[in-house]
Amino acid sequence: CPGEEGGAAKAFMARDGLWYGLDAALTWHPDDANEVLTGSSNSCIQTQYHFTGVAAHAAGDPDRGRSALDAVELMNVGVQFLREHMSDKARVHYAITDAGGRSPNVVQPRASVLYMVRSNHVAEAVELQARVDKIAQGAALMTETTVEKKFIDGLADTVTNHALERVLYRNFEALGVPSYTPEELAFADSLAGTYSGSDRAPGVGSQYDLDYAADAQARRAQAGHAMNRFLLPLYQGDAFQPGSTDVGDVSWQCPTAQIHVAAWPNGCPGHSWQNVSCGRTDTGHKAALHAGKV
C-alpha cells in the first residue's frame, strides 16, 4: 500500500485497527541487497507551519511589512541550533513549500515550511516535536507574524520479531535470489556508472555490528556485477536504523517482519532518480514478485 515515510498509509490503517487479530504481517522493501531486515526504525512526525505577515513594498515601505519568509528562515535557524541539543539518534528535516512569491521587491506576506522530526521512540519524537513548535512560535514573535501548524502524519518505531525473521530467512534460503538476463545486468552496470564516491549509499545500515558489516561489504565487492546476486547471512539485532516506515505502526498490532530484495544496483543512493528509474524495469518487477514468493 502507498506511503512509507511520507503519506503514512499503514499508520492510518493502524488507527482504524486493520492489523489487529492477524497472525503475522510480512512485507518487503526494494534495496540493493537480498537480506532479512532486522532492528527497529525511527518514529517520525510531519508538521506543516504556515506563517502570515503583512505585504509591503520592500524598498518604499519596508517598515510596514511583516515578512512571513523571514519567520520561516528564523525558524530554520532556530532548529539548526536545536540540533546540538538532540539525541544522537534524532533527526530534523525540512522543506520550504511556499516562499511567498517570485518578486524580491515585496515583503512576503505568507510562507510555509514542512518539518519532519525523527527519534527512536514515539514519546521522544513527540517531545522533540514540542521543541520545534516552540521555535516556530518564537520565529513568529520575532517577526510580528502569526503561525498556524497542521499535523500531517506520524509513524511509530518498528517492533523487532526475531522468530519471524528466522522463518523468512529459511524461505529465502530455500528459494534463492532473483536471476537476471544479460541485458538486465548490463542496464544495472550502466546505471551504477552514474554514481560514485560520496554519491554511493554506504550499503550496510547502523543496525549491524562492525564484523557483519565488513563481511557484507566484502561479499558485495566480489559480486562481479552491479546487481548483488547473493543472500546475506542472517543477522538479528535490536539496534535502530535511522529511516522511518509505516510498517512500524503495523508491528505494534501484530507480529511483523520484513525482507529486502535487490531491485537496483549495489550502492545506489537512497531516494535518488536511480532508485526511481528501476521501479518500472524488469529488475524491479522481478524483485517484487520474488519477495511475494519468499
Language model features with spans:
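Metal-dependent amide/peptide-bond hydrolase catalytic core
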Residues: L69, E73-V294
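Histidine/acidic-residue-rich, glycine-tolerant segments that coordinate divalent metal ions
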Residues: C1-Q108, R118
